[in-house]
């Protein structure tokens, strides 16, 4: 089954897998588009849209180890919910938002391992 990707309004190169918005709302428990976490994500997506790979110099963007194909995360570490958004660069510098989750287990990294697996499967479904 191939996942659909949808271009996000207001961005040139940012796309999200179908269901991403609902997944994000569930993770941050926030339905208001002008809420704290929606505003944070929108700001970070503007940086990503404008800067591409240069965004990785921002401390809130990080490459993910052991991901294949290579993926990255946007983080909001000092927030109560500690959300993460996993994304990948694809053709022509487009960015696909693949998965969002709440990091709760820093010691074991199990949240990341599980989330990376979900994101890898979604990306493979899209590019196949």
What residue spans do the PLM features occupy?
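Basic, Lys/Arg-enriched alpha-helical interface segments
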Residues: 1-82, 90-95, 102-128
